[in-house]
């Protein structure tokens, strides 16, 4: 049998959690709690924004789309990670690995585009307030959100196709906590310089270009805010952007170090740490950032809860 035929390599083995030892149970509980908090928090924000008419604005429309995206983003990796922590056989099929990698990168790219759209929305609201209602219509918001999803799901296709055609040897142990391009390419039996170059070009285009546009938007926002004469006006303008900027810095800060690099070898510890940040930590803190720092969402949550409570009370009368 040809040792370079990937059909002979039916599955991969994850070694990311192989050395957790006696802390396995605690790690499982912590990761499970983080996942449940992420699901519940993002579901709450998505539902409240959709149900409360006061939040039917472009800014909150994008926040709800981001919360919905985070639900699927975490679902591509964390359930399998939880299974691998408890299971003695930490495996995934060849096709399953490619699918996980594709959806993880598709949703990640979609988030990059969506965060850019949100920055543009804030730029229009603060720098061009008179034109904002005319430009940022409901139709445009829907089209921008759809474009973010579409472009995101198109971006990794070429990377996945190239990875699927690589020959893999008998060594099938992935030194990571989930399937991803860098650890997958390190297992190939041939030179992967072309793959690394393609990955770098696509990642650099998506990550650096979107991050650049976000920073340009915020540079103009800061310039406009500093021209506001009243302190209360400046504070209100900055508060509308603080949550989004915090999410941008956490998310982009980790993925830039992870994916915008031209090398095959990498630090396993650093990559696993960064993977935890952008696959677990960022989706988990999004609900905290957008709810605890946002009075409108807190008020909407209270209105939703009290309205349901009042309806339940009336139903029992």
Swiss-Prot record:
<dbReference type="InterPro" id="IPR000276">
    <property type="entry name" value="GPCR_Rhodpsn"/>
</dbReference>
<keyword id="KW-0325">Glycoprotein</keyword>
<feature type="transmembrane region" description="Helical; Name=6">
    <location>
        <begin position="238"/>
        <end position="258"/>
    </location>
</feature>
<keyword id="KW-0675">Receptor</keyword>
<keyword id="KW-0716">Sensory transduction</keyword>
<feature type="topological domain" description="Extracellular">
    <location>
        <begin position="161"/>
        <end position="197"/>
    </location>
</feature>
<dbReference type="GO" id="GO:0016020">
    <property type="term" value="C:membrane"/>
</dbReference>
<feature type="transmembrane region" description="Helical; Name=4">
    <location>
        <begin position="140"/>
        <end position="160"/>
    </location>
</feature>
<dbReference type="GO" id="GO:0050911">
    <property type="term" value="P:detection of chemical stimulus involved in sensory perception of smell"/>
</dbReference>
<keyword id="KW-0472">Membrane</keyword>
<feature type="transmembrane region" description="Helical; Name=7">
    <location>
        <begin position="272"/>
        <end position="292"/>
    </location>
</feature>
<dbReference type="InterPro" id="IPR017452">
    <property type="entry name" value="GPCR_Rhodpsn_7TM"/>
</dbReference>
<feature type="topological domain" description="Cytoplasmic">
    <location>
        <begin position="47"/>
        <end position="54"/>
    </location>
</feature>
<feature type="transmembrane region" description="Helical; Name=5">
    <location>
        <begin position="198"/>
        <end position="217"/>
    </location>
</feature>
<feature type="transmembrane region" description="Helical; Name=1">
    <location>
        <begin position="26"/>
        <end position="46"/>
    </location>
</feature>
<feature type="topological domain" description="Extracellular">
    <location>
        <begin position="76"/>
        <end position="99"/>
    </location>
</feature>
<dbReference type="GO" id="GO:0004930">
    <property type="term" value="F:G protein-coupled receptor activity"/>
</dbReference>
<feature type="topological domain" description="Cytoplasmic">
    <location>
        <begin position="121"/>
        <end position="139"/>
    </location>
</feature>
<feature type="transmembrane region" description="Helical; Name=2">
    <location>
        <begin position="55"/>
        <end position="75"/>
    </location>
</feature>
<keyword id="KW-0812">Transmembrane</keyword>
<protein>
    <recommendedName>
        <fullName>Olfactory receptor 6N2</fullName>
    </recommendedName>
</protein>
<keyword id="KW-0552">Olfaction</keyword>
<keyword id="KW-0807">Transducer</keyword>
<feature type="disulfide bond">
    <location>
        <begin position="97"/>
        <end position="189"/>
    </location>
</feature>
<keyword id="KW-0297">G-protein coupled receptor</keyword>
<feature type="topological domain" description="Extracellular">
    <location>
        <begin position="1"/>
        <end position="25"/>
    </location>
</feature>
<feature type="topological domain" description="Extracellular">
    <location>
        <begin position="259"/>
        <end position="271"/>
    </location>
</feature>
<dbReference type="Pfam" id="PF13853">
    <property type="entry name" value="7tm_4"/>
</dbReference>
<feature type="topological domain" description="Cytoplasmic">
    <location>
        <begin position="293"/>
        <end position="317"/>
    </location>
</feature>
<keyword id="KW-1015">Disulfide bond</keyword>
<comment type="function">
    <text>Odorant receptor.</text>
</comment>
<dbReference type="GO" id="GO:0004984">
    <property type="term" value="F:olfactory receptor activity"/>
</dbReference>
<comment type="similarity">
    <text>Belongs to the G-protein coupled receptor 1 family.</text>
</comment>
<feature type="topological domain" description="Cytoplasmic">
    <location>
        <begin position="218"/>
        <end position="237"/>
    </location>
</feature>
<dbReference type="InterPro" id="IPR050939">
    <property type="entry name" value="Olfactory_GPCR1"/>
</dbReference>
<feature type="glycosylation site" description="N-linked (GlcNAc...) asparagine">
    <location>
        <position position="5"/>
    </location>
</feature>
<keyword id="KW-1133">Transmembrane helix</keyword>
<feature type="transmembrane region" description="Helical; Name=3">
    <location>
        <begin position="100"/>
        <end position="120"/>
    </location>
</feature>
<dbReference type="InterPro" id="IPR000725">
    <property type="entry name" value="Olfact_rcpt"/>
</dbReference>
<dbReference type="GO" id="GO:0005886">
    <property type="term" value="C:plasma membrane"/>
</dbReference>
<keyword id="KW-1003">Cell membrane</keyword>
<dbReference type="GO" id="GO:0005549">
    <property type="term" value="F:odorant binding"/>
</dbReference>
């Amino acid at each position: 049998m040809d040792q370079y035929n990937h059909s002979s390599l039916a599955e991969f083995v994850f070694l990311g959690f192989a050395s957790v030892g006696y802390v396995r149970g605690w790690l499982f509980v912590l990761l499970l709690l983080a996942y449940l908090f992420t699901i519940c928090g993002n579901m709450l924000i998505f539902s409240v924004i959709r149900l409360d008419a006061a939040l039917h604005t472009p800014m909150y429309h994008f926040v709800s789309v981001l919360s919905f995206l985070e639900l699927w983003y975490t679902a591509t990796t964390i359930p399998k990670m939880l299974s691998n922590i408890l299971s003695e056989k930490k495996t995934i099929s060849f096709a399953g690995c490619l699918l996980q990698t594709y959806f993880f990168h598709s949703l990640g790219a979609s988030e990059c585009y969506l965060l850019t759209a949100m920055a543009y929305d804030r730029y229009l609201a603060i720098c061009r307030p008179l034109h904002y209602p005319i430009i940022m219509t409901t139709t445009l918001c829907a089209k921008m959100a759809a474009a973010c999803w579409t472009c995101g799901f198109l971006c990794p296709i070429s990377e996945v196709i190239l990875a699927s055609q690589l020959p893999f040897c008998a060594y099938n142990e992935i030194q990571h906590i989930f399937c991803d391009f860098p650890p997958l390419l390190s297992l190939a039996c041939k030179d992967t310089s072309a793959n690394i170059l393609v990955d770098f070009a696509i990642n650099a285009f998506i990550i650096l270009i979107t991050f650049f546009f976000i920073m340009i938007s915020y540079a103009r926002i800061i310039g406009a805010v500093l021209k506001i004469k009243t302190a209360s006006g400046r504070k209100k303008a900055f508060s509308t952007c603080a949550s989004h900027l915090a999410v941008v810095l956490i998310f982009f800060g980790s993925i830039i170090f992870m994916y915008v690099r031209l090398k095959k070898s990498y630090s396993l510890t650093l990559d696993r740490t960064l993977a935890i940040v952008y696959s677990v930590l960022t989706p988990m803190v999004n609900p905290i950032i957008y709810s605890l720092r946002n009075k409108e969402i807190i008020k909407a949550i209270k209105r939703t809860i009290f309205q349901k409570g009042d309806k339940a009370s009336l139903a029992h009368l």
